[in-house]
């Protein structure tokens, strides 16, 4: 008897309905609101005169490099907070394009995720998952258990441009400002693709977002994939921002150790001149050092900047050895490609870097009182 061949189903949603992504809202009482307007509060983003989501003024980004000019529109670190008594929250986003990766989930690069905020504690509610065939935007829905006034936070995509974002609520629902942060002066992060969030599975799994949720602190993510090279223009902009703590995660994108040496100490000196009282945390590359002399040289350069600061009387600096972050018993599981963290890697980074951020935040808060 001839063997019967069975068709292989390539759509997993037809096998497991729990993996289905809804592409239509099917709501007849939804009202959409533009998050660029009150009472929504945006964090980690710069709108400017053109009213476009970005992370810094275009004039600054354009003066740095073509990479920074392009990645400036990636909304890494962007958040919107609001409160409502609607029993569902929908989103409708408009995207000019969709960035695809072979080693980063689309939920991280292009998705949004929702948190409930209560008394400084953020509780994960849902990820708004982009459909697999998304090209220019999508809609998604999160249903809530009841109608009561609550504060929410939505995290923006890490590696995509967002032209418009609308929040959908049940018609007649109340809407107001969301809860503010305990530490409302933002922690400032500068660095590479890792700093930008590659390759987290959802936006809030970047290490900065994990720290922000843990410590109830605002933050600005100025990570630029392949484009963090310590240029004077970006250094001047970093120094112009009023930050609570500056996490200098600059190492990887310097084309070589010589470039890093020529730019790392000047970055510190320029920043410290404008911000004498802002704590600085230096982080060396997190890649596991395995017979790589260049990475060893880079670590020493970052450490030398830290030692220079200490030797010149600066007690508002600390150094984190990136090799130690991804070393140890579970060092093999922290990345997707020996460089970019997976969620376990970002959690590990948040644990180590977050401890230093917390120490520095408490020091500055004590000093301000």
Describe the residue ranges of each PLM region.
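Active-site-proximal beta-strand/loop segments in catalytic clefts of secreted hydrolases
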Residues: 191-192, 222-225, 249-252, 283-286, ...
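A short helix->loop->beta-strand "cap" motif at the edges of active sites that frequently abuts
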Residues: 275-280
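A general structural detector for well-ordered alpha-helical segments in enzyme core domains, enriched
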Residues: 207, 263-267, 298-305
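Structural motif
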Residues: 153-155, 247-249, 281
């Amino acid at each position: 008897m001839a063997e019967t061949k069975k068709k292989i189903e390539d759509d997993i949603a037809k096998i497991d309905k729990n993996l289905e992504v809804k592409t239509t809202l099917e709501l007849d009482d939804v009202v959409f609101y533009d998050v660029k307007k009150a009472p929504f509060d945006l964090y980690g983003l710069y709108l400017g005169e053109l009213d476009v989501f970005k992370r810094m003024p275009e004039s600054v980004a354009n003066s740095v490099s073509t990479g920074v000019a392009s990645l400036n529109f990636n909304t890494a670190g962007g958040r919107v907070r609001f409160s409502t008594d609607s029993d569902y929250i929908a989103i409708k986003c408009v995207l000019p394009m969709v960035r695809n990766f072979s080693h980063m989930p689309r939920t991280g690069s292009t998705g949004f995720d929702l948190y409930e905020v209560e008394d400084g504690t953020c509780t994960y509610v849902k990820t708004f998952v982009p459909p697999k065939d998304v090209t220019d935007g999508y809609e998604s829905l999160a249903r809530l258990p009841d109608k009561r006034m609550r504060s929410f936070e939505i995290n923006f995509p890490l590696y995509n441009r967002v032209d418009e974002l609308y929040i959908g609520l049940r018609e007649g629902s109340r809407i107001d400002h969301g809860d503010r942060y305990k530490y409302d002066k933002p922690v400032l992060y500068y660095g590479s693709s890792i700093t930008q969030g590659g390759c987290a599975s959802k936006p809030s799994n970047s290490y900065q977002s994990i720290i922000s949720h843990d410590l109830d602190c605002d933050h600005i993510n100025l990570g630029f994939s392949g484009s963090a090279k310590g240029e004077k223009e970006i250094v001047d902009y970093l120094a112009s921002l009023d930050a609570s703590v500056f996490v200098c995660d600059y190492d990887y994108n310097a084309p070589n150790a010589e470039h890093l040496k020529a730019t790392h100490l000047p970055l510190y000196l320029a920043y410290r001149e404008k911000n004498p009282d802002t704590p600085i945390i230096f982080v060396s590359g997190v890649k596991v050092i395995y017979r790589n002399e260049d990475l060893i040289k880079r670590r020493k350069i970052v450490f030398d900047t830290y030692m220079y600061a200490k030797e010149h009387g600066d007690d508002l600096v600390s150094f984190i050895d990136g090799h130690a972050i991804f070393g140890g018993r579970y060092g093999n599981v922290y990345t997707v490609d020996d460089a970019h963290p997976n969620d376990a890697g970002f959690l590990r980074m948040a644990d180590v870097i977050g401890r230093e951020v917390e120490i520095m935040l408490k020091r500055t808060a004590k000093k301000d009182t």
